[in-house]
Structures are given as C-alpha cells and as structure tokens.
Amino acid sequence: MVNKIQAYQPVLLSILRIAVGLVIFSFGMAKIFHFHAGTFMPPTGSLPWILGLFELVCGFLFLVGFQTRIAAFLLSGLMAAAYFISHFPKSIFPPENGGMAAAVLCFVFLYFVTSGAGPISVDAKLNKA
C-alpha cells in the first residue's frame, strides 16, 4: 500500500509547487497591478512594490518550474524577512501576529531548494534534452 502511494510523490511534488507558485505569483500580481480586494496598495517604486515585483518574477519562475531551486531560495529568504520584519515584532506566535503564511511558505520554499521542481516543470524538460 505504501509503495503505491509513494509512486505519486514526484507528481504531487509538482502539484504542490504549482499551487504554491500560483499563490505567491498572485501576491505579486496584486501588489504590482493593484487589483486585489484588500486596502493595501503600495505606491509604485516603494519597497513593498519592489518586493511585489520580486514575488511576481520569482513566483512565475517557481510556478513554471524554471530555475526552481534559485527561485525557491530567494523566495524562502523573502518570506523569512517578511516574517521577522513585519510579523515577529507584533508577537512571537504566528496566530497572533498574522505571519502564518510567511512562516509556512518560508519552509515550503526551503524544501524546494533541496527537492527541485519535480517532473512537471521546465527544469525537468531541460534536463531531459
């Protein structure tokens, strides 16, 4: 039974990467193009806007699985910085400081630094060529 389940691991790794990539890419899209429902709209050229551009570009690379380890490393650092700069000063506990997404995504991205993109990715296609 376990072997049957383990056979799905590579594909599920790619599915996880795509799902997380869509989330981080959408964060960047919302900050850059100001189309989200929230009230936070960073001014063009401000630090939050630049970080949104970073989320947009690295999020897209992560989403499609191109240079995944590099994009994941950069995004992991970005999420760690976001947590410690924006959330940690409010409280040490993520449920109290609103930093759950940043904390979890930091470690998800760190995992992809070691695992790579998975079989459904540009990286996998380039490695076969």
Describe the predicted segments one by one.
Residues 1-33, 39, 47-53, 57, ...:
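Extended, low-polarity transmembrane helix blocks
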